[in-house]
UniProtKB/Swiss-Prot annotation:
The gene is rsmG. It catalyses: guanosine(527) in 16S rRNA + S-adenosyl-L-methionine = N(7)-methylguanosine(527) in 16S rRNA + S-adenosyl-L-homocysteine. Its main location: cytoplasm. Pfam families: GidB. This is Ribosomal RNA small subunit methyltransferase G. It comes from Anaeromyxobacter dehalogenans (strain 2CP-1 / ATCC BAA-258). The lineage of its organism: Bacteria, Pseudomonadati, Myxococcota, Myxococcia, Myxococcales.
Amino acid sequence: MDSAFHEALASGIEALGLPVDEAARALLERYADRLLAWNRKVNLTAITAPAELAEKHLVDSLVLLPFLTGAGTLLDVGSGAGLPGIPLACARRDLSVTCCDGVAKKIAFVKAVSAELDLPVRGVAVRAEGEPEREGLPRADAVVSRALAEPDRWVPVGARYLAEGGTLFAMLGREVDRAGLEAAGAAEGLTLVGLDVYELPVSHAARAVARWQQR
């Protein structure tokens, strides 16, 4: 990877105060390298500039780290090329991650790169529709969607995969109405416990993370 990638990754991690050690950074670089290599043959991401990939895929995935203290399992729904699940596994190698997506070629990449990097990540080629037993998906301490669907569509599905005491996350490309998030959670017996708004440090793109827990 080029110097622009390293600078974007380091500046993003430092600006947002994320707990990412040198070993994790090395894994993140290897993941990004394999992602771009596979992307030449398989459509995994529209972002191909290394610095932009570092910020908008890696750093933006890692923002969940401070909220995962105590979580042992994570389910990444609509994971695509393993985002945010694989970057989180790079930084939290004690975290058992399941990435699911309905597109088999994307999960083939997830499986291959996770094996190559020796990450605790399982890939499942299935579209999550709220039926974990039928789909072969676990209930997890943290259930995550990254811009998969609007919150009122995501929460009823994601709630089905929560382990007892777990947290449901929605990673959003913008700030949304808090009242709408509260209503979406309440309909599923969940309480909105956080809405954190942040800005990516290089592009200044606005982002938000919503968190719900069982009542």
